[in-house]
Amino acid sequence: MIEPELSYVYIIAELDFDDDSKHTGFYKIGKAKNPFYRLAQLQTANARGLQLVHTIQCSKDKYDWDAPMDPNTRMNPIIEEYVGHREMQIQDLFDDYRCTPDRRLKQNHIEDVDDTRTYGGNEWYDFRKIGIDKVIDMIDDKFPPYLGILEKQLSLEFF
C-alpha cells in the first residue's frame, strides 16, 4: 500500500512593509505538497513578508491509494491531476480579481513595469475590495476537501 500523499491548494498573503501584521490585499493561490515549504521558497524571492493564510486539502482518503505512482516523478498522477484541477477551479472563481504583474508592480511603486517576472505569473489576486475572509468562506463553501474516488463517482452518477 502506498502511503498517503497529501497535496494542497494554498492562499499566501503578501504583508505590508510598514506593519507586517497587515496584509497588502494581494494573495497568491497555488498548489504544493508542502505549503510551508512553498512559503519559504516564495519568501526568498519576495522583499515583502508572506504569510500562509489558508489551505485546502486535496488528497484522497486512505482507501484510494492503490493507483500506481509515476516512476519518474514519484507522484500519483490521479492526485496531481485532481489537485491541479481544484487549483484551476478556485483560480477561475476569482478570475475578476486576478492581478496582471504590472498592476502589482505599480501598486508597489516599481517603475519598470516591463519586468513582469518581478512578481511572478498569474497566480496573484487583488482581494482588497472583497476581503480575504469572504474569499476563504466562498472557497470553503464551494470546494470542500476531496473525499476520494467515491465522491467523484457519486457526483458523476447523481449530478
Positions of predicted regions on the chain:
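Non-catalytic accessory segments flanking enzymatic or RNA/DNA-binding domains
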Residues: 1-159
